[in-house]
Amino acid sequence: MDNQRKKRNSILKVRQETNLMDVLEDTTVATSSGATNRRVSFHQLKQVKNYDRAGGQIIDATPIKEKAYDTMSSDGNSTSHTTRLDMDITGLNSTPVTPKTQTPFNGSMDMSVENYDETARLFDITRDKTICVYEKTVETTTTKVVERVVRVPEGSSGANNDTLALFNMTDRAEVDMSVDGGSEGALKVDDTISVFNQTNVEPVDMDITVQKPLDDTMGVFRSPAIPTSSRIQKTSASTMDSQNMSMSMDMDITSNEMMAAFKSPKIMSSVLVAAVKDSDDMDLTGLVNTAAEDVADDTMAVFRTPTRAQTTIQKTSGEIPESVDMEMTGIGNSDAPDDTMAVFRTPTRAQQTVQKTSGEIPESVDMEMTLLALLQPVSDVKDNFDDVAMDITQQTLVGVSDDTMAVFKNPAAEKKTPGKPLFDESMEIESTIVCPDNVTFSETAQPENPAYHSSMLMSMASEVSEDVVVQKTSESLQQSSMRMSTTITEDVTASKNPESSTISEVQKIPEVVQKTSNGVEDIQNASETPEDVSMEITSEVVEGERGTMYQMSTMDVDSLQKTSLASPKIQMTSFTDTSEKMGGVSETSLIQTMMIEASESMECSEAPEDVTASPEGLTMAPEDVTVASNVSGIVSVSSISRRRRSQLQESLHRESPRRMALEKNLSMMSQMGGASEALAEFRQNKLKNQTTLLNDSVNTTIGANTSESIGRDIFKMNTSIRSPAHRSSTAPSPMVSKTLPESPKFHVTPFDAAIVNVIYLTPEDAETQEPIPEAFEFEKVLSAEESNVHKEIDTANWSISGAIKSNLDAEVMNIARGQAEMKFLELRGKFAKESNVEIAQKIQELESQNLELAGKIRDSQNLRVLQKQIEELQKPQFSLEEAERIENEYHETKVELLRAQAASIRRQHELLMTIREERRRLIHEIEEKDELLARLEEEDRKKKEEMVERVRGVMRA
């Protein structure tokens, strides 16, 4: 014990002073089974006991010292987890104990969850140190489930849905890939995955046509398929059944508004057209003769760049029945729904050549065509039907560049031709086809809806890139054959609006048939009438670039003479010697200048329906435009003029809602026979009431807030600035209306606006905040009465302004003099106020100076007394002896204070040393008690072990 105490004392003596109460360690040994007995010292060494690996017991012998990094954990296991040591260090000084023989643990332990009380036996401190190892082997037998699909019998209905059989790579049995189902009337399934089947060696039926059910909602979104060439055989009966099944689908894209947005014009072949030959209404909208291998996805058709193709339609044989309606419906047709995707499609440059070789055209043939979808009839039709067999050829023009690049190209060299007529894009085309059997067809666009007709004309006016060329032979109209060659070329630039790029012009052959003699006489008289319209616009036609020429048709002169009385007409003077006097460039600039002047005249007169374009009187009325011309040459328009006209048309379209409303009104009036009267009345009222409406609107906006206190009218003062060309004849001068005293005859009883608002505008119920109805009536009557009174006063002032004009200058001078006097008085008062402020400041400064002088005077009177006090203060207060005495007293006092402080420090040091000694004594006593407690615990443990041995002996016995 003495050696251990000395050792601890040497350890506790450290160089730095530490608080011993803080470094005391809790050396109490836990009595629970989870804690082990160990003791930690202040050095980096651990004391452990030797462990007998063979016997599994701890040897009570001299401990072994290990380093700190190889210490044991709190549960007794080392870091290497190879041994289990007991950290009990009691009995170091006792005699070594011989190792015990290994005794097997005979007790049983239930590890089940139900008998949870047995769990505590794991931590029983009385049990033996033998380690019990439990090994649990769980043997699980897994069942291997192998699933595969066997062959489905051929005739069952489940063969259509056997999709899993396609992916069965283990079973090499033959899989039924038939999509028919084996039953009559069943729908065919689009077995797309059969293409990728590696196990199927049989040919796959790729016919994906589905018979349209009665109520098929999703059928709207399906694209119609084209049968393969192997199935298109007219001799086979099965092929005809498949064709009839494929044609059972509704291919009319105009009947469904939703399909019009998703279907492409190039989705049907000529075979599908042949199946509808027994139908009277042959709606061939969007049908293009395309091979099956060239058919692409309908969705990608929206993004394709259109190709310029030339489609030639030749009538070879057969007769057209009277009830055949070859209608190609597009945007221009008011009966058809709107094609949503049509505005995003780029129109193709196509050339249609219609040559009539034989046969007769019946009276009721309606061939309405739009340029959105080109008609291509069927090439093969059976003879047992009365349909027309037409030959369809499609050629691609060589050398045709992109439509978009045509905008940026330089204009070609212009070549002047003796052509006469001028054709504008905004004009309505009326063409006459003269037949040898004295039958005249008038081709006119006459929609049923007048409002839609006016909007269609507006869209026609926005077409800026269309060139119309008419080729007509010089033969006599009576001896010419029934052959008309018409070429139509579209050249729409990509820089225009989508609406303008969609060509909505519709050309019809009406049902009214006229005689050839009447048509010839009308055309001959048309050149002699003053309504003859002709103008020359020339440009060079480049082969392969400009394409073919446009169509211009001659209109019926009777319709011109009838419409000229009820609507404005285009009068264009022909320049016969244009080719000799001016070149192509000057001629083009002249036409551009005329079009610009037309736009300026429209903007100045605010009449978009009436445009004057030339000194001779070029007048265009988009609501009803007619053209009469006898074509004898080729006319074309250069690209520059088209671009200039496009800019002009875009500027004219800025007021399209207003013009469309006017045209709608005029169209409605024209049905009742009052178009000319309504137009004349509109123009007259607009010219007369242009400024009157402005003044009325200003007076009505003032309302009940207008009173006598309101002076000049700002809007009336700015009348000359707002419209210098149209000054009101009744508007008085603002100065006169201000200076002239009001006449008692037109005096209005003054009122207070606040009182009126309180009396008449107070709601009956403050919670509901609903005003009295009489308040609104009073406000309306008051505003109307006051506006009338002001008008009468202004009229009277204007009538007597001549008499007052002589005294006006004098009154103005008096007013100016009075204003000058008021200004002078204001300046005088301002000057007086500033002078008063300056004088007050000077007075304050003088008073402060006077106070300072008074104080100085008082100080000068007490000067002698002050000098005596200064002298006394300047004299020394202490002598040398007194100063030394005071210094000595100071030093003595300081020494006494230092001595007292030193004595206090010594007493405190002695007290501190006493406390330290007492603390050391207490620490030693505590250590002794701890050692005694440890010995007692060791003895108690040994007694418990003896008791356990006795109990085991009893149990063994």
From Swiss-Prot:
Keywords: Cell cycle, Cell division, Centromere, Chromosome, Chromosome partition, Coiled coil, Cytoplasm, Kinetochore, Meiosis, Mitosis, Repeat. Residues 830-950 form a coiled coil. Residues 91-106 have a biased composition (Polar residues). One of its GO terms (cellular component) is kinetochore. This is Outer kinetochore KNL1 complex subunit knl-1. One of its GO terms (molecular function) is microtubule binding. One of its GO terms (biological process) is chromosome segregation. Sequence repeats lie at residues 87-90, 109-112, 206-209, 251-254, 282-285, 326-329, 367-370, 390-393. The keyword Endoplasmic reticulum does not apply. Acts as a component of the outer kinetochore KNL1 complex that serves as a docking point for spindle assembly checkpoint components and mediates microtubule-kinetochore interactions. Kinetochores, consisting of a centromere-associated inner segment and a microtubule-contacting outer segment, play a crucial role in chromosome segregation by mediating the physical connection between centromeric DNA and spindle microtubules. The N-terminus contains a number of repeats which contribute additively to bub-1 recruitment to unattached kinetochores. The repeats are not required for localization to kinetochores. Component of the KNL1 complex composed of knl-1 and kbp-5. Part of the ten-subunit outer kinetochore KMN network that includes the KNL1, MIS12 and NDC80 complexes. Interacts with the protein phosphatase 1 (PP1) catalytic subunit gsp-1; the interaction is direct. Interacts with the protein phosphatase 1 (PP1) catalytic subunit gsp-2; the interaction is direct. Interacts with the MIS12 complex subunits kbp-1, kbp-2 and mis-12. Interacts with the NDC80 complex components ndc-80 and him-10. Interacts with knl-3. Interacts with kbp-3. Interacts with kbp-4. Interacts with kbp-5. It comes from Caenorhabditis briggsae. It is found in: Cytoplasm, Cell cortex; Chromosome, Centromere, Kinetochore.
